[in-house]
Curated annotation (Swiss-Prot):
InterPro entries: GCS_T, GCS_T_bac, GCST_C, GCV_T_N, GcvT/YgfZ/DmdA, GcvT/YgfZ_C, TrmE/GcvT_dom1
Keywords: Aminotransferase, Transferase
Organism, scientific name: Frankia alni (strain DSM 45986 / CECT 9034 / ACN14a)
Enzyme class (EC, first level): transferase
An annotated GO cellular component: cytosol
Hydrolase as UniProt keyword: no
Membrane-spanning segments: none
Catalytic activity: N(6)-[(R)-S(8)-aminomethyldihydrolipoyl]-L-lysyl-[protein] + (6S)-5,6,7,8-tetrahydrofolate = N(6)-[(R)-dihydrolipoyl]-L-lysyl-[protein] + (6R)-5,10-methylene-5,6,7,8-tetrahydrofolate + NH4(+)
UniProt entry tagged with the keyword Transferase: yes
UniProt protein name: Aminomethyltransferase
Family, as annotated: Belongs to the GcvT family.
GO MF term set: aminomethyltransferase activity; transaminase activity
Its job: The glycine cleavage system catalyzes the degradation of glycine.
PANTHER family: AMINOMETHYLTRANSFERASE (PTHR43757), AMINOMETHYLTRANSFERASE, MITOCHONDRIAL (PTHR43757:SF2)
């Protein structure tokens, strides 16, 4: 994996016996020795988990009119939020497909920090840079910041133990300091639990990681890899780009229309998305809950009770909370909530009930 990039915490992961694998061009921990996906998942649901997600992209858009420019490109409406708030948004292509889903941190009208997915950072930066007007700069800051996600019921206690603010509203952020070092603290996450995402400077990330674990000894704090991150987000029905969202899957199909500023005059993909919304999508993202032992996996075909093909699984896993197989699938427009469908599991039908996620209660706010 010599061609893969590494986070500033690579050495910490190796010391913890992490199983490392490539993800989005980065060598990242999937699970940790002596723990595993199940225990790490349960730590987040019951106590607190600490994730290294420093592989996530970062890009800064600065200059006079920076926020206005971002708003004319990305799907959501920055006019809905004030400085000090973050917003989930989409970078779409002309056909309405999703090039990436990302978080926009609005500092001011002259500064927006974007956090794309790792594999798509360069493309998002290139698209924005090519469209930027005079006076607006788009700077790749992929290795300018680390990202630590602290998630779970005990997350506020742990973050507060470091002297960092914890009382902000959901999706709000502050520029704080820890031991004189700058760190952005945002009330957000990808797990459905109360949580925070901390963005220290890249080189400060190991020290902050160590401090979190030192303070978390009595709280049941656990390192959490990308394996449990996937089971946690799937239980919430949160989409993953490259599976549930992609350049050929639109926000209308993926039920992400809430992240589109439909009243805006300009954003990439606007005409195609307005047309699709008016006509109705040919397929929609649904949840699948196994009624037997089958576990849905990406790309498995889905058929109706009569055997007719109706779609394909986009995400699937075993739910540690529910102890059953769950998944997300793009299904034909005629499929409805409560329908029984079958997933082709190595040539055998796996019965599933069509449901609306989340699969378990969410408490992020």
């Amino acid at each position: 994996m010599a061609d893969l990039r590494r986070s500033p915490l690579y050495g910490r992961h190796v010391d913890l016996g992490a199983k490392m694998a490539g993800f989005g061009g980065w060598e990242m921990p999937i699970e940790y020795a002596g723990r595993g996906v199940l225990a790490e998942h349960q730590a987040v649901r019951g106590a607190v988990g600490i994730f290294d997600v420093s592989h996530l992209g970062k890009a800064e858009v600065t200059g006079a009119g920076a926020a206005e420019f971002v708003n004319a490109c990305l799907s959501n409406d920055l006019g809905r939020i004030a400085p000090g708030q973050a917003q989930y948004t989409l970078c779409c292509n002309d056909e309405g497909g999703v090039v990436d889903d990302l978080i926009a941190y609005l500092f001011s009208g002259e500064r927006v920090l974007l956090v794309p997915n790792a594999a798509n950072n360069a493309e998002v930066v290139a698209r924005l840079a090519a469209a930027a007007p005079a006076g607006v700069s788009v700077t790749d800051r992929h290795t300018g910041f680390g990202v630590l996600a602290v998630q779970g019921p005990a997350a506020p206690t742990l973050v507060a133990a470091l002297g960092l603010p914890t009382d902000g509203a959901y999706m709000s952020f502050v520029e704080a300091a820890w031991k004189g070092r700058p760190v952005i603290v945002c009330r957000s996450g990808y797990t459905g639990e109360r949580g925070y995402e901390l963005l220290p400077r890249w080189d400060d990330t190991p020290a902050l990681w160590d401090a979190l674990f030192a303070a978390g000894e009595g709280l049941g704090a656990s390192p959490v890899g990308l394996g449990a991150r996937d089971t946690l987000r799937t239980e919430m029905g949160y989409p993953l780009h490259g599976q549930d969202l992609s350049p050929t899957i639109t926000p209308v199909q993926a039920r992400s229309g809430w992240a589109v500023g439909w009243g805006k005059e300009r954003f990439w993909g606007r005409e195609a998305l307005l047309a699709e919304r008016a006509a109705g999508p040919a397929r929609l993202l649904w949840g699948l809950a196994s009624t037997g032992r089958a576990i849905p996996r990406p790309h498995m075909p889905v058929t109706a009770a009569d055997g007719a093909p109706v779609g394909e699984v986009t995400s699937g896993t075993f739910s540690p909370t529910l102890r059953q197989g769950i998944g997300l699938a793009l299904l034909d427009r005629g499929v409805a909530e409560g329908d029984t469908v079958n997933v082709d599991v190595r040539g055998r039908p796996g019965p599933m009930t069509v449901v609306r996620p989340p699969f378990v209660p969410s408490t992020p706010r």
